[in-house]
């Protein structure tokens, strides 16, 4: 662990392998924290190694795509508002990604295509990325459906579950009437807002990190970012009055 922190010089992500929802993951800033978090993980017998990854500060982005073994269909790119290291299920997600360059979007589309082909995916694939400036890094690749599939399907109008099912039984993306690649962005903003149940769980740690804590989500759609965000907050019952803001 000390060697890892020396190599990376900054924060690292300490995590067990093969977990869902970011269970047991922690961001460590020094050797003492690394040792503490590894001891916590080791309280439960581990069949797989504990991983120590470099922590990058950047913009987190995500795609759900369908691959037929040759071509890939990417309905859109989602951008997370929260800092990197916050679990994707706890992040506010914005479609289309609105603060990254065309180069970053094209790089994400190309990486998605190459990874799906290299993994021989026929069906759904979910990939999470970090953009640090114009550099794009892969966080993780999941050759399966993800919790963002209903969201991206609804806001783009592309039935990716239906398409993936057809692809699995032998159809191609072109045969299903779609052009491969990253699809044209919508002219509206769609924001997915996580919903938490902290008020029902006394003593729960409410700070956000790699381990997922949300229990639901809602959606705000509008022509502008501010209006979509307002609707999403309204759906999550997280609105504040002007009096509360003054306090």
Where are these regions (language model features)?
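Conserved small/polar residues in nucleotide/adenosyl-binding loops
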Residues: 3-11, 240-247
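ATP-dependent carboxylate activation and anion-phosphoryl transfer catalytic cores
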Residues: 10, 20-23, 27-242
